[in-house]
UniProtKB/Swiss-Prot annotation:
Pfam families: PseudoU_synth_2. This is Ribosomal large subunit pseudouridine synthase B. The lineage of its organism: Bacteria, Pseudomonadati, Pseudomonadota, Gammaproteobacteria, Enterobacterales. Keywords: Isomerase, RNA-binding, rRNA processing. InterPro entries: PsdUridine_s_RsuA/RluB/E/F_cat, PsdUridine_synth_cat_dom_sf, PsdUridine_synth_RsuA/RluA, PsdUridine_synth_RsuA/RluB/E/F, PsdUridine_synth_RsuA/RluB_CS, RsuA_PseudoU_synthase, S4_RNA-bd_sf, TruA/RsuA/RluB/E/F_N. The active site is at D109.
Length: 250
């Protein structure tokens, strides 16, 4: 049985599918000494040598193990690999891999802090991010503005934002953390559109003044993980997260 090259290499952690496709376009990937094309399928029986940017790599699943790390992102860091403004980048804080590279499972904007997951398994990252799988993301949200029962109902039932409708799966007040000017909430979404939570509150004339992600799927931000630090998930936790999208650890 054959599979597309970008799917295989993405699954084995050599980059996202888009990144693999770009490398193919630039002639950076070859099989048995011949450059390949996007969409080309692989049959393992016919492969002798595969190289990426001149370095020989293995595509045997027995040589690959899915890794996932949790990073506690501080405010002020961005979730891209390069930034012309020279702002701090989350990838610079992660442990080095050999030829594989970390793939972010979703993003947080520069002013949001908290849980970020990274994996070396491209297929797993894609599945965990895909809206159809409805993976829960949970946040602490500090809000400034006039909020009443009707406001909460609107946010649960759905509000119109720039790229369509959006609604919290659940949202509740954290009473002990509220002040006269700001109120804290715990909210759950099942998707991760750009600045979605901030846009939802803006649609009801309120402003998010702090946003912290505390959970992705069944993975919670450890209370003892300091801002700017990372920790690797156990094999059991990797399998539990993978099972949410019916993918077992490789």
């Amino acid at each position: 049985m054959s599979e597309k090259i970008q799917k295989i290499l993405s699954h084995l952690g050599y980059g996202s599918r888009r990144n693999i496709e770009n490398m193919i376009k630039f002639g950076d990937i070859s099989i048995n000494g011949k450059k390949i094309v996007i969409g080309q399928r692989l049959n393992n029986k016919n492969i002798e040598v595969i190289t990426i940017k001149g370095e020989t790599v293995s595509i045997k699943k027995t040589d690959f193990k899915t890794k996932i790390i949790i990073y506690n992102k501080p405010e002020g860091e961005i979730c891209t690999r390069n930034d012309y403004k020279k702002r701090p980048i989350v990838f610079d804080k992660l442990p080095l891999l050999n030829i594989h590279r970390w793939i972010s499972i979703g993003r947080l904007d520069i002013n949001t802090r908290g849980l970020l997951l990274f994996t070396n398994n491209g297929n797993l990252a894609n599945e965990l991010m895909h809206p159809s799988n409805k993976i829960e993301r949970e946040y602490y949200i500090r809000v400034f503005g006039k909020i009443n029962k009707n406001t909460m109902n609107i946010l649960k039932n759905g509000v119109k934002i720039k790229d369509g409708n959006a609604a919290f799966k659940s949202i509740q007040t954290i009473d002990h953390a509220c002040s006269k000017k700001n109120k804290w909430f715990k909210g759950v979404l099942c998707e991760g559109r750009n600045r979605e939570i901030r846009s939802m509150w803006q649609a009801v004339q309120c402003q998010v003044s702090r946003l912290i992600r505390i959970r992705y799927g069944n993975i919670f931000l450890p209370k003892n993980l300091k801002l700017g630090d990372w920790s690797e998930l156990s094999s059991e936790s990797v399998n539990n997260l993978s099972n949410l999208v019916s993918l077992k650890d490789s």
